[in-house]
Amino acid sequence: MTIKLIVGLANPGAEYAQTRHNAGAWFVDALAERHGQSLKEESKFFGYTARLSLAGHDLRLLVPTTFMNLSGKAVSALAGFYRIAPDEILVAHDELDLPPGVAKLKLGGGNGGHNGLKDIQSKLGNNPNFHRLRIGIGHPGDKSKVVGFVLGKPLASEQPLIDDAIDEALRCTDLLMQDGMDKAMNRLNGFRASAR
């Protein structure tokens, strides 16, 4: 199994660019930049895309331009066009159940109430077996505050921790493409950024 598509979940527009809910897109933007690429809008895939060669593998990047709860439209359009199977897809997203400074890789599982993951699963024929990169953003402590929290910007103390976790996830993506998911998972899942 090789990852052929990495998706960064986000809401479109400048007003959302720095919000916690866009952490997945921060990762994909940084991955493109790390490899000297920039994402370009491709309307037939409802998003911004780029193509990389990583460890000898062809890899496509996607940041949907749909709203978060319609992310599956972009993912299924690109995956369908290039015949990419669900288990060859890695979706990077913000994760309330992990603190800032932590990021973890996993295959399948629930959607944790994340509307982007929900829509992707449903548009992939209700198949949850795609990989996820869960980027910790922390939790506001009260369910009723979640929407305001994910659509808010990280605190000044949290942003460097999230950035460090994304940096480690970038290094682990190189490892993933070279040595496989298990090695990348073992390394990333043990990482925790320390406060500066």
Swiss-Prot record:
Keyword Metal-binding: no
Taxonomy, superkingdom: Bacteria
Residues holding tRNA: Y16, F67, N69, N115
Uppermost EC category: hydrolase
Alphabetized InterPro entries for the sequence: Pept_tRNA_hydro (IPR001328), Pept_tRNA_hydro_CS (IPR018171), Pept_tRNA_hydro_sf (IPR036416)
Gene Ontology cellular-component terms listed: cytoplasm
Protein localization: Cytoplasm
Reaction it catalyzes: an N-acyl-L-alpha-aminoacyl-tRNA + H2O = an N-acyl-L-amino acid + a tRNA + H(+)
E.C. number(s) listed in UniProt: 3.1.1.29
GO molecular function, one term: tRNA binding
Positions bearing the site annotation: Discriminates between blocked and unblocked aminoacyl-tRNA: N11
Site (Stabilizes the basic form of H active site to accept a proton): D94
Active site residues according to the UniProt entry: H21
Record's keyword terms, sorted: Cytoplasm, Hydrolase, RNA-binding, tRNA-binding
Gene Ontology biological-process entries: protein quality control for misfolded or incompletely synthesized proteins; rescue of stalled ribosome
Keyword Secreted: no
Quaternary state and interactors: Monomer.
Protein's job: Hydrolyzes ribosome-free peptidyl-tRNAs (with 1 or more amino acids incorporated), which drop off the ribosome during protein synthesis, or as a result of ribosome stalling. Catalyzes the release of premature peptidyl moieties from peptidyl-tRNA molecules trapped in stalled 50S ribosomal subunits, and thus maintains levels of free tRNAs and 50S ribosomes.
Family statement drawn from the similarity comment of this UniProt entry: Belongs to the PTH family.
HAMAP family: Pept_tRNA_hydro_bact (MF_00083)
Protein name: Peptidyl-tRNA hydrolase
Lineage of producing organism: Bacteria, Pseudomonadati, Pseudomonadota, Gammaproteobacteria, Enterobacterales
Gene: pth
